[in-house]
Regions:
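Residue-level detector of structural "landmarks"
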Residues: 2-6, 15, 21
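Glycine-rich His-Gly loop
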Residues: 146, 349, 440, 509-514, ...
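Sec-dependent N-terminal signal peptides
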Residues: 43-51
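Blade-level signature of beta-propeller repeat domains, shared across WD40, Kelch, NHL, RCC1
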Residues: 436-441, 449-450
Length: 736
């Protein structure tokens, strides 16, 4: 039959059932008076019957019940009709989740090319991924490795970095579906034991187990309800941070209050653990205690009330020694990175918005000497190597630059020449002459190098062998003016020889918060999109840490709109310069980046074809009432701070700025049932309101994962399915 009608029908059916039926009816009407098309008419009648049957089988859109809940802020009434969705343990919420997932699954699983895309995602992810080797106190070397499609990376042990690795701890054996993740491992200072933390189903709640590092035997020690913790070894036990056991109904949504530090002695039950520190006067704080390798000093961290932290030191050589405060008022960041005898090396931004390294002593910890002073680039971290040098990791225009410094006088010795514009992280050890680092870029998978301090050369230690070739792609960095004229950087990755005719699909990604920097890094999940002709754009927004504390503060509290203006400016620049058009543009972000996407799609819905807010903070008036949301107040402010702050939050809160009768972009909201960082109620209420307000014909869906959390520790099998859904949704709704 003529004119490619089969392709038109397939496209209409994939878009939505209504379009499918309308297309068949229109086609039949066009041909009904032409007898030469009798066979076509019969075919169309059969297709119409099939379409009606197809429509009857499809799940109906969810109509969410509304109630009359209203909150009053400074005399202003704010309705919250979907408040009941905050109860994640109710049967009604569970039924709503099931109904929404049924609609979403029906749509996603029928997208043209999804299965082909999933197959390609598995192919490009199936290569050996290796971490940076590290040397432990028992003389052994350890390395994380994933053979390709393992759900979780495995910890291996070696006699030397060149030795054949032997499995030391395989988290894939801890669950059948890969949803138990290894979060951290901590060797005792004599090398005899290793404590490790795990999380289940992506939750922030942690459990601690202990194994004999020599025999790999699992000991009976087991700690529950730990959170945001390490295991700080001292003597024959370790310190850890935990909360009281929560109520069963709200373990994943209730406010976390009263963080405490305990000491656990090996071979005893958790019920015998000794309470080491608590502060009932300040329940909305985090506390953590760390111990140096020599077990001569302990450091107490306190944070949560402002953008920085308080730091205290305790001399463990003296019985009942007091905590001595090093920093106060929580206005700045400060933490120890190394100790040597009486010396303490502190990384801080006190009087240094771009960060610096100072040295002090345990005898007089309030007197500091600048060792690596503040520079015009952001100091991201330091690594001590041999007895005399420090590797300083800097960020310049969001990519890594590294320099070697003399530890004794702070003199800059030389630059470490990295393979290109990308990101690098270093592992070295005081007193040892080796340094390994990982390097990646948008087109270079993570590669491990050995850096020779004597020659200054970088030697490849482990380089991945992949099933794809990215030599035909390139990355450029551009700068554009935001609404107020601020110069904003953005990385673009695409096929070489691209035409700037406005026809290219773009995946625009951003974050913009909490002093977190977005640097060039590799993800195999982007490869099929790039291969299909898409452009990956990553923009460095204010609120992040790319240019120091001033850049961060420019995107917080009453300056938060700057972040959204930067992101909107990136979209407008890409369109104005011929990279794409509104019909080809997708915006994506997670967590604080989900807030970003939610705010930008409500402020400029016509600017984008697709929006994917992932695990986003959508209710800016109530976010601080769930789990650890109170900890975000230094960046956001709260609706209870002042009337001015309330009105500012109300002005951009994604949930409260969805307008009835508005045509929104094709939207896929994502969340998960065990997300106790940004509770799923944010996404639930946003999706329900979006579906109510949308007047356009583009899909408004929510994808609610099970046995998953905020993203950390998610098994690869789940990641692949999720990315297949997201990318196929984006590609279909941008015409790829």
């Amino acid at each position: 039959m003529p004119w490619g009608w089969q392709e038109k029908i397939a496209s209409a059916a994939a878009q939505d059932r209504k379009n499918f039926i309308v297309f068949i009816l229109q086609s039949y009407n066009n041909y009904r008076n032409f007898t030469i098309f009798g066979n076509m008419k019969r075919s169309l009648i059969l297709l119409l019957m099939a379409a009606i049957a197809f429509d009857a089988c499809a799940p109906k859109p969810v109509v969410t019940r509304k109630d009359n809940t209203v909150d009053t802020y400074f005399g202003t009434e704010v309705p919250d009709p979907y408040r009941w969705l905050e109860d994640d343990s109710s049967e009604e919420t569970a039924a709503w989740v099931k109904a929404q997932n049924k609609v979403t699954d029906y749509y996603l699983k029928r997208l043209p090319g999804r299965e082909k895309l999933l197959k390609r995602l598995k192919e490009v992810a199936n290569y050996e991924k290796v971490g940076v080797p590290f040397h432990e106190k028992n003389g052994k070397w350890y390395i994380y490795k994933n053979n390709g499609l393992q759900n979780q990376s495995v910890l291996y042990e070696m006699e030397s970095p060149e030795d054949v690795p032997v499995v030391f701890l395989d988290p894939n054996t801890l669950s059948e579906d890969g949803t138990v993740a290894l979060k951290g491992c901590y060797f005792s200072n004599d090398g005899r034991y290793m404590a490790y933390t795990i999380s289940r189903s992506g939750s922030d709640w942690e459990e601690i187990y202990v194994m004999d590092a020599r025999t790999k035997e699992l000991l009976p020690d087991h700690i529950e309800w730990a959170k945001f913790t390490e295991a700080a070894w001292c003597g024959d036990g370790f310190y850890y941070s935990a909360y009281d056991r929560p109520g069963e109904d709200h373990a994943y949504s209730g406010k976390n209050e009263g963080h405490k530090i305990y000491y656990h002695k090996i071979g005893t039950p958790q019920s015998d653990d000794v309470l080491f520190f608590e502060n009932p006067a300040e329940p909305l704080r985090f506390y953590q205690f760390t111990v140096n390798e020599a077990e001569t000093m302990g450091f107490l961290y306190e944070d949560g009330a402002d953008i920085g932290n308080n730091l205290y030191v305790k001399d463990l050589r003296k019985a009942d020694s007091p905590f001595v405060q090093i920093t106060r008022d929580m206005k700045n960041a400060c933490y120890p990175v190394e100790t040597d005898g009486e010396l303490i090396y502190l990384f801080t931004n006190v009087d240094a918005p771009m960060n610096k390294l100072v040295v002090t002593t345990i005898g007089n910890p309030k007197v500091w000497k600048d060792l690596i002073p503040e520079w015009d680039c952001v100091l991201n971290g330091v690594s001590f190597i041999t007895d005399g040098f420090i590797i300083a990791n800097y960020s310049k225009d969001a990519s890594t630059h590294a320099y070697l410094y003399d530890r004794h006088d702070g003199r800059r010795v030389e630059e470490l020449h990295l393979p290109g514009v990308g990101s690098a992280s270093f592992i070295a050890k005081l007193g040892e002459p080796w340094c390994y680092y990982s390097y990646s870029s948008f087109t270079t998978p993570g590669t491990i190098y050995f850096w020779n301090i004597e020659t200054g050369d970088s030697i490849v230690y482990k380089q991945p062998k992949t099933a794809f070739d990215l030599s035909g792609f390139e990355t450029v960095q551009v700068f554009f003016p935001s609404k107020d004229g601020t110069r904003i950087p953005m990385f673009l990755t695409y096929k070489k020889g691209i035409k700037l005719d406005g026809s290219n699909p773009v995946y625009l990604y951003g974050y913009g918060g909490f002093d977190i920097s977005l640097s060039p890094s590799f993800s195999s999940m982007r490869v099929p999109y790039l291969e299909a002709g898409g452009i990956y754009a990553q923009v460095n927004l204010r609120g992040g840490g790319e240019y120091g504390e001033a850049w961060h503060l420019a995107g917080t509290k009453m300056n938060k709109q700057n972040v959204f203006d930067d992101f909107i400016g990136a979209a407008e620049w890409l369109i104005a310069n011929g990279y794409t058009s509104s019909e080809k543009l997708a915006i994506v972000g997670g967590s604080n980046g989900g807030l970003l996407v939610g705010a930008c799609m409500t402020q400029r819905p016509e600017l984008y074809a697709v929006a994917v807010p992932q695990v986003g903070v959508m209710d800016m008036l109530r976010y601080h009432k769930f789990t650890i949301g109170w900890n975000w107040a230094p960046d956001y402010g709260t609706s209870e701070d002042s009337e001015e702050m309330f009105r500012y939050l109300l002005g951009y809160s994604p949930l409260h700025n969805l307008k009835p009768g508005t045509a929104y972009p094709a939207t896929l909201v994502t969340t998960a049932d065990h997300d106790d960082r940004v509770v799923p109620a944010h996404s639930f209420k946003f999706a329900a309101t979006l579906q109510e307000c949308n007047s356009g014909d583009k899909p408004q869906l929510i994808r609610i994962d099970s046995k998953a959390g905020h993203g950390g520790g998610k098994p690869l099998a789940k990641v692949l399915e999720e990315q297949a859904d997201i990318y196929s949704f984006i590609m279909h709704n941008t015409g790829m």
